[in-house]
Amino acid sequence: MFVDKTLMITGGTGSFGNAVLSRFLKSDITNDIKEIRIFSRDEKKQEDMRIALNNPKLKFYIGDVRNYKSIDEAMHGVDYVFHAAALKQVPTCEFYPMEAINTNVLGAENVLSAAINNKVAKVIVLSTDKAVYPINAMGLSKALMEKLAVAKARMRSQGETVLCVTRYGNVMASRGSVIPLFINQIKQDKDLTITEPSMTRFLMSLVDSVDLVLYAFEHGRQGDIFVQKSPASTIEVLAKALQEIFGSKNELRFIGTRHGEKHYESLVSSEEMAKADDLGGYYRIPMDGRDLNYAKYFVEGEKKVALLEDYNSHNTKRLNLEEVKELLLNLDYVQEELKNA
């Protein structure tokens, strides 16, 4: 599907970018693809990636999604875009909400506008469960990013740039997530700091995150939002699973929720569930293609309306201790940390 095509990954030196490149480099995709452009701000991470991967099809572009000119110039000749650049730390965004807006909303606007201007065929925008019923600045900014993508999709004609969204739950062992924190605390013989033991989170691997984006890329229609069905766990069970894996007797210390945290996360709202397509391992939330001429809808109505529960980390499949251990032991990150323990 990428034969002789040019792909851009914004925020490409982050966890998602590394996971995509790892997948591509282990398959025939890299042989078929024309070029992969990594667009990000950090020249040190780009240099590290350039040396580590040493692949002539990788091209590196220094720039910031906040700067339209830099992203527009880098996108010349690009066929597809995976937009992963974001501010995603919830407490940080609570203290600096305008920074979240500048990157997650205005930056996304720049990426989408540049893609349309450069006649990119398809853009996949990466979002988060925190965009559903948002209570924090990060979630609010991502919700607005989704609205931007869908609004622009609604205005596209047949044959123009296709804009789709993917929503993630908690991506295990991604940068800034709780699993690296717990492992570091175990190695340093410190207490494992748990915010709220009964708090639940979806558990997705980086492999799952790539699967979701590639599924959306292959099946996405204009304005679609895609969600992968995922299991969940309480934070306490996750911490205990890591204790057992690493043979740790560290104490668990409960510290209370951080700024902007929710007790559980939702991947699909109840309103969206009423209209979502169940695709087996995924949900597709189609774009509402109606226009602002509401008079005709007073007569036609909306056919697909129902009262359904939202899809959240409390009502999805809940993993027990042994199931969480099995999931964790399949992660490359955990395997590497065990070797170095």
Swiss-Prot record:
Its EC number is 5.1.3.2. Gene3D superfamilies: NAD(P)-binding Rossmann-like Domain. Keywords: Isomerase, Lipopolysaccharide biosynthesis. It catalyses: UDP-alpha-D-glucose = UDP-alpha-D-galactose. GO terms for molecular function: UDP-glucose 4-epimerase activity. Pfam families: Polysacc_syn_2C (PF08485), Polysacc_synt_2 (PF02719). The keyword Isomerase applies. The keyword Flavoprotein does not apply. One of its GO terms (biological process) is lipopolysaccharide biosynthetic process. Epimerizes UDP-galactose to UDP-glucose. Belongs to the polysaccharide synthase family. This is UDP-glucose 4-epimerase.
